Amino acid sequence: MKSKSSLLKSGLLLSLLTLVSRVLGLAREVVKSTLMGTSATADAFTVAFMIPNLFRRLFAENAISVAFIPVFTQHYSMPSSAQVPCSSKTKEFLSAIFTLMSSVTASISLIGILGAPYIVRLFDTDQSLTVSLTRLMFPYLWMISLAAFFQGMLHSIKVFVPSGCTPIFFNVSVIFSMYFLNVSHMNVAIAAAIGVLIGGCAQALFQLIFVYMHGFRFTLQSPLKAMHDEGVRRIIALLLPTTVGIATYLLNDLVCTALATSVEIGVAASVQYSLRIQELLLGIFIVSLSSVVLPDLSFHVMRKDWQSFEDLLITAIKIVMLITIPATFFVLFSSDRIITLVYKNAIFNELSVRMTATIFRWHSVGMLAIALNRVLISAFYAQHNSFAPMIAGTISFVTNIILATLLFIPLGGKGIAFSLSAASMVQTVFLWMFLKRSWQITIPSLYKTSLYYGVKITLFSVIALVPTWASSFFTAYFFPGSHKIISHGVPLCVEALIFSCTGCILLLLSRDEFAYKALRSIRFCR
C-alpha cells in the first residue's frame, strides 16, 4: 500500500517527464503557429488531426483506463522479470486484448482512409487538403492504441517512466518534420502529418522494449478465440456503458470543431492553441496524478481497504486543488502576456493574440473541474463502475452542445470555450452526486474536507494576486522593450515569482500538509 509521500514521489517522477513532454508539446504548437498561424492551413491540420485523435481516446485511453488496468490488476498474476515471464493465463489474456485492439483499430483506420472525403464535409475547411491530411494521419490510431496497450501493462506493475518518455518522442518527431521537410518546400501541414506517423510509431516501439524486458508475452490469435477470453468479457462488460459516454464525447468535439470552423477563419486553430497551453498546465501534475492513482485505488478496492481508498482520494483531490486553483487565477490575470510570449510572431499577429487570449481565459475557468473529473472518474473506474461516469459525461455533452450552439454566433470562439468550461463543471457536480451513492466512502467527511481546502486555496490565490497586480505597474515601467521577451517574458516571470512566493508563505503560515512535506524534502536534500 502506498503512503501519501509515495504517491507524491511517483507522481512527481512522472510529472517531471510529463513537464518535458508538455513543454515540447507547447513548442510543437509554437512551431505550428510560426509556420501556419491562424490560417486555413492551420484549421485544416487541426480538423484532420482531431478525427483520428478522437478515436484514439475511445480505443486507447478509454479502454486502458476504464477496464484494462482494473481487470488486469485484480484478476491476473504479474511477471517478475524477463527470465520469469507471465503465466500462461496472463499470456492468453494479453494475446486476446492485443488481437482485438489491433484488429479493431486497423479496421477503423482503413474505413477512415476510405471515408475521409465524407467525414470532412462536416467542416468548413480546405476540403482537398483536409482529406489528404486525414488519410495520412488515420494509421496513427492503430499505432497509438498499441502504445496505450503497452502503457497499461507497464502501469499495472507501477512502471511509469517509459510511458512518460514516449510523448517526448512524438513531439520531437512532429517538430523536426515541420522544420526539415518544410525546408524542402513540402506543405507544412503534410510535413506535420508525417511527423505524427513517425511519432506514433516511436511511442509504440519504445514501450514494447520495456514490456518484453518486464516479462510480458503475447501473440496474435484468432479474433473468435480472443472474444471468448474470460478477461476480455470482463473488459467488454465494463466498456459497454462507457461506449455511449465516449461516443457523446466524440460527437461533442466534432460539433464544437464544426462550429468553430464556421465562425471565421482561424477560430478552430485558436481554440487548439489555447487548449495546448491548458494541457501544459494540467498535464504537468494532473494527468500524471490520475495515471499514478488509478492502479493504487484499484489495489485498495481489491483488498476492500476503503479507509485507504478514501484517504488516497482525498489526497489526490487536495493536490488537484492546490495546483489548479492558483493556476486559474494567475492565467486569468496574465493570459495576454502568456499568449503573446508563446505564440506571437510575424504570422501570428496581434489579432491572433487577442482571439487566442480571450479563448484561453474562458478555457482556464474550467481547469479545476477538468482536473477534478480525472481523479473522480478514476475512483469510479477502480470500483468497476463505468455507468456513473457515462451518465455524467452524457449530461456534460448535452450541456456543452446546447451552450455552444446558443453562444457561438454572438460570442464566437469564446462562446465555444465557455461552453466547454461550463460543461466540465456540470460533469463535476454530477460525479460528486454519484459518488454519494458509494456506501463504502464517508461522503460527508470527503465533501467537508474538499470544500474547506478549496475555499482556503481560493482565498490564498486572491490574496496572492494583490502584490502580483501591484508589481505589474513596475514591470511595465522597467521593461518597456519592443522585443516580447523583454516586454512580456521578464514581467511574466517576475509576476509569477511574486504570486508563487506569496502563495507559499500563506500555505506555510496555515501549516498546510503539502507545503510542510515539500519543505522537509528540501531540508532532507540539503
From Swiss-Prot:
Transmembrane segments: 35-55, 58-78, 96-116, 137-157, 160-180, 190-210, 235-255, 281-301, 313-333, 362-382, 391-411, 415-435, 459-479, 489-509
Pathway: Cell wall biogenesis; peptidoglycan biosynthesis
MF annotations from Gene Ontology: lipid-linked peptidoglycan transporter activity
Main location: membrane
Signal sequence, renumbered to the chain: none
Topology with respect to the bilayer: Multi-pass membrane protein
Protein name: Probable lipid II flippase MurJ
Lineage, broadest ranks: Bacteria, Pseudomonadati, Spirochaetota, Spirochaetia, Spirochaetales
Gene: murJ
